[in-house]
Amino acid sequence: EELEKALQALTAQGILKAGETFEEIDAKRAIVIPGLVNTHCHLGMIPFRGLGDDCKDRLRVFLLPMENQAMDAEMARLSTRYAIGELLLSGVTTVLDMYYFEEVVAKVMDEMGIRGIAGETVMEKDSCDSKNADEAIERGIALIEAYKDHPRVSGAITPHGTTTCSPETLKRAYQ
């Protein structure tokens, strides 16, 4: 009983007393591990899984044009719900997502109870949710601000890469 009272869980905000919410299970014939962490994910890309895998330059020839044509906030929301369901079923409790419409992604993370970082993707060229790198950075800043006090969900600015962002854009994203 004293142990149950002392049981605590760490959160982004500090220590939260959690003793009464835990359920004791019989794990004698099982392996118990902590929740897994996915540190590189594109939750909204579920509809494109496996498509264009045979393309030589899959990103530029297939994915970017497909995303610009087909991806919108509602598709990102539905895809994210599906992807988080898969993550939770496989033992992932924390995810770093880097994609588009991350304000929608962050909301779904919150609704589904996963711990996550929703990172707005930044590229030089236009994408399905931003006209340019500056707009994407502004979206990321707004997301960081909106979730700065949330116990499980955080916002971030996530530059796509060195081949899709200039050195100046990378510096702006860092700042």
Segments the model singles out, each with a brief description of its role:
Residues G35-I46:
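Histidine-centered catalytic micro-motifs
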Residues K28, G44, D53-F101, G161-T169:
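Divalent metal-binding segments
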Residues E1-I33:
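Histidine-rich, glycine-flanked metal-binding segment
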Residues L7, T11, G52, I84, ...:
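Structural signal for hydrophobic packing residues in well-ordered secondary-structure cores
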Residues P47-L78, M112-I137:
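Active-site gating loops and adjacent loop-to-helix segments of metal-dependent hydrolytic enzymes
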